[in-house]
Amino acid sequence: MVVTWNRVKLLTECLTMLRAQTRRPDVVVVVDNASTDGSSDVIHTQFPEVDVVRLVRNAGGAGGFSAGLAEAVDVHEADLVWAMDDDTIPTETALAELLASFTAYGPGLGLVASRVVWTDGRDQPRNIPRDPGRASKADRRAAHAAGGRPIRTASFVSLLIEAGAIRKYGLPTADFFIWNDDFEFTARLLRHAKGIYAPKAVVVHKTAELGTKLVDPGERFYNEVRNKIWVFRAGEAFGPLEAGVRVGAAMRNWALFYRHSRDQAAMRSGFKMGLRDGLRTRPRSTREVLAEAGYDLAAHW
């Protein structure tokens, strides 16, 4: 399942490599976030086997992944969903390796995260899944036997997600739009289920440059602040103690973002508005957000 917005060239590369998998996906779903570059037409012409979900307005990555996971689970009755961005270019064995790790682990596994590298083979720092820290010896042994290690959160760049976990713990929160939607979703799911990082399942995250943890968010700092506050206020992704630790880490990161920003005025504005909206509001229901984008969720969500 791929979410796209106005990156038809990268999307074409992504879909071409999905076709080239040694173990091809049974079904491919693309959520087109109201692209204006002809993405849907290109898919219909070059990849007629793909199920295209075209939204009438851009719902952001959060809305796109919510709609795509629902489509895969409800319409196609998937057992496992491989979710990714449109600038994710999988290596030929990526899916086979994800499935091998999932099968080797056994019951209780909610998701498997890929190793994400840049075009030169170096790891993308922002896409290295976080270790749970307090994982038990048994969990670490099970992850090691499956060729990986335990994780607490991961990114939507490339995730294999068990459908039962999606049904049980819910879809991503669509109202996040961008930033922290994958952080919240995977943390919520992995508060209850298990997750592992599978380093043999390699994908290329074809960004313009190698990412760093000190990315300058600019105006998107609003989404970073508001959404992080929403995550910690909701209480579904983290318990009180873990949330306290994460809040401290977030504040340290915000200070670093600000220090390295090229537009600190925009950062200050984004922080003030994000703080205000994060404390005064809560996310709208995913059903409401997707309905505005032209996608109707099934009643059970």
What is each model feature region?
Residues 7-20:
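Short, well-formed alpha-helical segments that are part of the catalytic scaffolds
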Residues 17, 24, 32-41, 88:
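A conserved acidic beta->alpha catalytic loop
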Residues 40-63, 67-75:
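Conserved donor nucleotide-binding strand/loop of the catalytic core
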Residues 77-87:
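Short beta-strand-to-loop acidic/aromatic patch adjacent to the donor-nucleotide binding site
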Residues 93-126:
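Conserved donor NDP-sugar-binding/catalytic core segment of glycosyltransferases
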Residues 131-152:
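Short, flexible, basic/aromatic active-site loop/helix in glycosyltransferases
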